């Protein structure tokens, strides 16, 4: 092993430097440097608290805070030299602070460990990312509401088993995705409450002997509460797992939505058109217009599901308190956040631009005997038991398949072959409009109910 000298803040106990490969293997700065802003935010709050607790002088506090702000400017200007030998974002910033302001920089870490420091950084970062994601969900929901209102009367087939089932309106179908996203929003809001608890002050695992005032840093950093147990504060990552669980559900919804969009843009369905800016072509087939955005979102969902499993597996065997294993929490969490945020952004941009092919949807709804249930309900209203009506209509559908006729295309005489209870008024029931208008209750597909649901949706978004 190489004995190339490394620069470590903890080297006093060691008689030889860390091997150069091991230093690179154990370093996390390549990926955790994205926490720099929140690391500096936490350090500024910590320095302010140390001054109020009498650990730092006001001059020392001011020097530290000014130095940290200058370092943030260096990072954002691309002028900061990230060093692998300093392991991580925390030690890189602390070393640079000491370079800038001298020995006072070494006092910043008083009463603090990297264990509670990184746990705080991740929570601050994730809290901000959740807020961004919540905004993208709302933006996507707004697009769905606009489309649902615009197409409240456009009729399409509803499916079960991907077989034609009953007519629905396009607006009603889109509102199903609105409802799923509303639950995703609720889950993330709830998750944020548990993210927003402060571990800073837990130190390595047992707290600190310094007279820290955790309520001060809690207030300065905008946390809702101080963590109640120092061992728990530095060791658990359940908040990251919970986020990945909520993110997995949201990505599952987007993946299902993507599957429908992919199907609907195909020549076999031809239900919708996506703008060219959300599609790509083929390097060999000149006619192709591929729905890459929904296909990629569908594919990316697996990444987030995998990160959830990875984090659960990471944590399941760890004794209290902190273990180096937890360095592996960041990359899956970062990627889960990036994937969900970017997928939502793509959908929020794309959904308002979707154009339904109204006639193709209507023709598809007309095929497949989609008003068969309406005929059965019609016979129930004539006094027949539903099971008998089900069988009667089943025979009528069989006849329609053999003769190539939809129920609405059959003559009255043909329909009466299956039940003498059928009369001229049946044709109002068998129209697509009659079918959707009949389902005029809360949650139903009738255009009036779609518009009412849009109004409720707008009120929900306005209350956020």
From Swiss-Prot:
Query: Could you tell me the superkingdom of the organism this chain comes from?
Result: Bacteria
Query: Which CDD domains is this protein grouped with?
Result: Argininosuccinate_lyase (cd01359)
GO cellular component labels? cytosol
Under Gene Ontology molecular function, one entry of this record is: argininosuccinate lyase activity
State the compartments where it is located.
Cytoplasm
Give the record's GO biological process terms: arginine biosynthetic process via ornithine; L-arginine biosynthetic process
Q: Where mainly located? A: cytoplasm
Q: Keywords assigned by UniProt?
A: Amino-acid biosynthesis, Arginine biosynthesis, Cytoplasm, Lyase
Query: Which family does the record assign?
Result: Belongs to the lyase 1 family. Argininosuccinate lyase subfamily.
This chain's protein is named Argininosuccinate lyase
UniProt lineage: Bacteria, Pseudomonadati, Pseudomonadota, Gammaproteobacteria, Pseudomonadales
């Amino acid at each position: 092993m190489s004995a190339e000298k490394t620069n470590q803040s903890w080297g006093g106990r060691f008689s030889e430097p860390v091997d150069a490969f091991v230093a690179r293997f154990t370093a996390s700065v390549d990926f955790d440097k994205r926490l720099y802003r929140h690391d500096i935010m936490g350090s500024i709050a910590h320095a302010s608290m140390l001054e109020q607790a009498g650990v730092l002088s006001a001059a020392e506090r001011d020097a530290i805070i000014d130095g940290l702000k200058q370092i943030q400017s260096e990072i954002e200007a691309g002028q900061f030299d990230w060093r692998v030998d300093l392991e991580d974002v925390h030690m890189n910033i602390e070393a640079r602070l000491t370079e800038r302001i001298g020995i006072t920089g070494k006092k910043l870490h008083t009463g603090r460990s990297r264990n509670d420091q990184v746990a705080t950084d991740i929570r601050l970062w994730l809290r901000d990312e959740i807020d961004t994601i919540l905004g993208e969900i709302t933006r996507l929901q707004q697009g769905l509401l606009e489309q649902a209102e615009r197409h409240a009367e456009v009729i399409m087939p509803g499916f079960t088993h991907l077989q034609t089932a009953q007519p629905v309106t396009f607006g009603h179908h889109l509102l199903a995705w609105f409802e799923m996203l509303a639950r995703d929003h609720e889950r993330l809001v709830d998750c944020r409450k548990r993210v927003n608890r402060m571990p800073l002050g837990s130190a390595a695992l047992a707290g600190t002997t310094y007279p820290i005032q955790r309520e001060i840093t809690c207030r300065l950093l905008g946390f809702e509460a101080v963590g109640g147990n120092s061992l728990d504060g530095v060791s658990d990552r359940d908040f990251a797992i919970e986020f990945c669980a909520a993110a997995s559900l949201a990505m599952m919804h987007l993946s299902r939505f993507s599957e429908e969009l992919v199907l609907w843009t195909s020549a076999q369905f031809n239900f919708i058109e996506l703008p060219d800016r959300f599609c790509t072509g083929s390097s060999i087939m000149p006619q192709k217009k591929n729905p890459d955005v929904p296909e990629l979102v569908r594919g990316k969902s697996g990444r987030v599901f995998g990160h959830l499993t990875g984090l659960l597996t990471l944590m399941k065997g760890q004794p209290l308190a902190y273990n180096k294993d937890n360095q592996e929490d960041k990359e899956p969490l970062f990627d889960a956040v990036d994937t969900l945020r970017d997928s939502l952004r793509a959908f929020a941009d794309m959904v308002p631009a979707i154009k339904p092919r109204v006639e193709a949807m209507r023709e598809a709804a007309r095929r497949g005997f989609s008003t068969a249930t309406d005929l059965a309900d019609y016979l129930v209203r004539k006094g027949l038991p539903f099971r008998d009506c089900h069988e009667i209509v089943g025979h009528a559908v069989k006849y329609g398949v053999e003769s190539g006729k939809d129920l609405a295309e059959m003559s009255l005489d043909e329909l009466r072959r299956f039940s003498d209870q059928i009369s001229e008024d049946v044709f109002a029931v068998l129209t697509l409009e009659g079918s959707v208008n009949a389902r005029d209750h809360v949650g139903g597909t009738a255009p009036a109910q779609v518009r009412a649901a849009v109004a409720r949706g707008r009120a929900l978004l306005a209350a956020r």
